[in-house]
């Protein structure tokens, strides 16, 4: 099982993406109130397979429920008061030294149990169709391996995730303190709400929304680019080409576009700054506050 974990993590290397594939909705996996490691193995299949190794920690046994094609996994760490959900028992999440290998060296404090090393936590192996759809909450650290036609990942906790190169579209939503690493993709839509960061390889069309102090960094873009920041988070695009670059900032967040843009439209309300290395088309700007727009290297 350790070999499976290592091979899936290694698949995050930013190699060239394969030819685009048409994405169709796939069955969904929801993981909640859990401390766990997850490995998603992508296969030619229509259903979802789940294998669990409980590990050596004193965490509750994971419960797996099926609702049609969808799968729900409950880690048993949810708290209720008078029948009302009060969050979970997870505190003080610490990531490992290498976020390309989520869970290695990580630990988390669990109420009434103490500190749990992720290497002792349950290991969930998910065998998924090529259109991957995962929602995770709690302290769930996971990798999604190669071969996906599309990936939809929602990370609403403190765990880190790594997504290997994807043939088609990637949608990565982050709410909490965890980080997400994304390989190459045909298009990328990412929503960062909280203190976590998203780091991605080359993509085509890009849509980024940041609300909070989290950051998004993309190696390369080749397509329409839409960036929205509400808060102090930053967006960095290292290089690439975008026929239309649309930026909206409300707050102190900054945008650094290191490629070549065609038409550029910037709206700033606050102290945010926008730098575009090169613009070949029309540049429009609306600034209220101390923000600034700079074109040129």
Language-model segments: residues:
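Gram-negative bacterial Sec-dependent N-terminal signal peptides
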Residues: 1-21
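Conserved G/P- and acidic residue-centered "switch" motifs that form tight phosphate/ATP-binding loops
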Residues: 176, 194, 251
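Acidic (Asp/Glu) and glycine-rich low-complexity loops/linkers
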Residues: 21-174, 179-191, 199-201, 243, ...
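Short, surface-exposed interaction patches in beta-rich subdomains
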Residues: 198-297
């Amino acid at each position: 099982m350790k070999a499976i974990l290592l091979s899936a993590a290694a698949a995050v290397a930013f190699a060239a993406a394969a030819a685009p594939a048409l994405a169709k909705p796939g069955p969904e996996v929801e993981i909640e109130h859990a401390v766990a490691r997850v490995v998603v193995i992508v296969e030619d299949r229509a259903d979802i397979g789940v294998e669990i190794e409980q590990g050596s920690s004193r965490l509750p046994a994971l419960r797996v429920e099926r609702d049609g094609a969808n799968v729900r996994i409950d880690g048993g760490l949810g708290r209720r008061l008078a029948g009302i959900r009060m969050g979970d028992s997870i505190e003080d999440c610490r990531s490992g030294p290498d976020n390309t290998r989520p869970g290695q060296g990580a630990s988390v404090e669990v109420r009434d149990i103490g500190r749990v090393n992720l290497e002792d936590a349950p290991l969930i192996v998910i065998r998924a169709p090529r259109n991957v759809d995962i929602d995770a909450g709690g302290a769930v650290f996971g990798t999604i391996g190669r071969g996906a036609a599309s990936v939809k990942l929602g990370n609403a906790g403190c765990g880190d995730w790594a997504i290997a190169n994807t043939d088609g579209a990637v949608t990565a939503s982050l709410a909490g303190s965890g980080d997400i690493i994304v390989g190459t993709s045909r298009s990328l839509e990412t929503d960062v709400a909280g203190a976590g960061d998203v780091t991605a390889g080359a993509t085509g069309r890009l849509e980024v929304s940041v609300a909070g102090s989290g950051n998004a960094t993309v190696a390369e873009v080749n397509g329409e680019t839409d960036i929205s920041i509400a808060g102090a988070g930053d967006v960095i695009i290292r290089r690439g080409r975008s026929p239309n670059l649309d930026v909206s900032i409300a707050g102190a967040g900054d945008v650094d576009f290191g490629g070549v843009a065609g038409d550029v439209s910037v709206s700033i309300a606050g102290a945010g700054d926008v730098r575009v290395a090169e613009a070949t088309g029309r540049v429009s700007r609306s600034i209220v506050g101390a923000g600034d727009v700079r074109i040129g290297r």
